[in-house]
Amino acid sequence: MVRVRAVVMARDDSSGGWLPVGGGGLSQVSVCRVRGARPEGGARQGHYVIHGERLRDQKTTLECTLRPGLVYNKVNPIFHHWSLGDCKFGLTFQSPAEADEFQKSLLAALAALSRGSLTPSSSSSSSSPSQDTAETPCPLTSHVDSDSSSSHSRQETPPTAPIATVESAAAFPLATRPQRRRSSAQSYPPLLPFTGIPEPSESLAGAGSQGWGSRGYEDYRRSGPPPPPLALSTCVVRFAKTGALRGAALGPPVSLPAPLTEAAPPAPPARPPPGPGPTPAPAKASPEAEEAARCVHCRALFRRRADGRGGRCAEAPDPGRLLVRRLSCLWCAESLLYHCLSDAEGDFSDPCACEPGHPRPAARWAALAALSLAVPCLCCYAPLRACHWVAARCGCAGCGGRHEEAAR
């Protein structure tokens, strides 16, 4: 359903905060549907899972089976977390757009899961009312989609069903919710709005427009789409192939037919060339027959070659550079800079970087010089790094990370 890149977080009850799972690192997190019965053995349509796999070593960092009663919290545009029973998971996204896309897919999966779990309970409601109330799932509640979740609970759950809420929903009076639920049950037939296509994204957008705490986030996410229709409406596609861009941009619309009449005579010579085979071949063939693809390491677009690889990638694994770092014992210099010359956040510059702006450059180079006396192999880093650079420029195998196309 969706695939994003984020850092998987876990709740630390001892400190009361969130910590990265497995030492951190970006993971490929996806919401997907698994065919077959759920582990509980309830629904027949299949179940939905949230699966996370770290890009660095393909290690599974997140495995969560979705069930009704999930409580979703949106702390800020790029950090969301949810709880399911005693389990708590969190994700730190790279952009608000990816976070919004993940939340919409999660809402869609839970809406489909709720409809699937309500089907058997509605058929057995006439025989055993107690089973109907026991099988009724708790709807999803979140900071952003509180209105849509309340309308979802009004139409699918009885007035006495428990509703999972979050701390931000305390601003609403609790006494008015059963009354609104009864009135909606009397005026609208149950389950009718949910018999068609799932509409979690539309309800989310509607809740954002009426939002009680997410109006800023909704305006931020929806601020981009309006410009593309304006740009498409102002361009004239009819004159793009005739080369009359100057007349379309500067001249009035009345003067545009003149270039068309002048361009009409060259049109007949263009028709005969498609008949012979040799002429259209140079026009259709691109210089290197390359296609645009997305890199699996940095998620950037690149021109894919015949071997499926592209240019240099800073985040791609580089065995040659790793060998240079190990042979020169560069980790000793990094450890020295981290423990002695790092800032308040624990960041430090590269040991061999000559970039200006360091607060204590003299102390930094003096410490590295003293360390090189104790670890002489540090002096080999410069020539080894130069050899690696030459090998990467020559295209030697194992030297220099390259863009690789993501698996489809």
From Swiss-Prot:
Q: Which residues form the signal peptide?
A: none
Tissue specificity note: Brain specific.
Q: Which residues carry this modification: Omega-N-methylarginine?
A: 246
The UniProt entry's GO biological process terms, in alphabetical order, are: negative regulation of epithelial to mesenchymal transition; negative regulation of ERK1 and ERK2 cascade; negative regulation of lens fiber cell differentiation; negative regulation of MAPK cascade; negative regulation of transforming growth factor beta receptor signaling pathway
What UniProt keywords are attached to this protein's entry? Cell membrane, Lipoprotein, Membrane, Methylation, Palmitate, Phosphoprotein, Ubl conjugation
UniProt keyword Signal present:
no
* Gene Ontology cellular component list: plasma membrane
Positions bearing Asymmetric dimethylarginine: 238
Q: Which domain of life is it from?
A: Eukaryota
- Where in the cell? Cell membrane
**Classification via Pfam families:** Sprouty, WH1
User: Where is composition skewed (Pro residues) in this entry?
Assistant: 265-281
Domain KBD intervals: 192-242
Q: SUPFAM superfamilies recorded for this chain?
A: PH domain-like
Q: How is it modified after translation?
A: Phosphorylated on tyrosine.
User: Where is each SPR domain found?
Assistant: 294-405
Record's compositionally biased regions (Low complexity): 120-130
Q: Using the UniProt annotation, give all residue ranges assigned to the region (Disordered).
A: 118-226, 256-286
Q: Which InterPro entries match?
A: KBD, PH-like_dom_sf, SPRE_EVH1, Sprouty, WH1/EVH1_dom
Membrane topology recorded in Swiss-Prot or TrEMBL: Peripheral membrane protein
The record places domain WH1 at 1-113
Summary of subunit composition and partner proteins: Interacts with palmitoyltransferase ZDHHC17/HIP14; the interaction leads to palmitoylation of SPRED3.
Role noted for this protein: Tyrosine kinase substrate that inhibits growth-factor-mediated activation of MAP kinase. Inhibits fibroblast growth factor (FGF)-induced retinal lens fiber differentiation, probably by inhibiting FGF-mediated phosphorylation of ERK1/2. Inhibits TGFB-induced epithelial-to-mesenchymal transition in lens epithelial cells.
The protein depicted here goes by the name: Sprouty-related, EVH1 domain-containing protein 3
Organism the protein comes from = Mus musculus (Mouse)
Please state the gene responsible for encoding this protein. Spred3
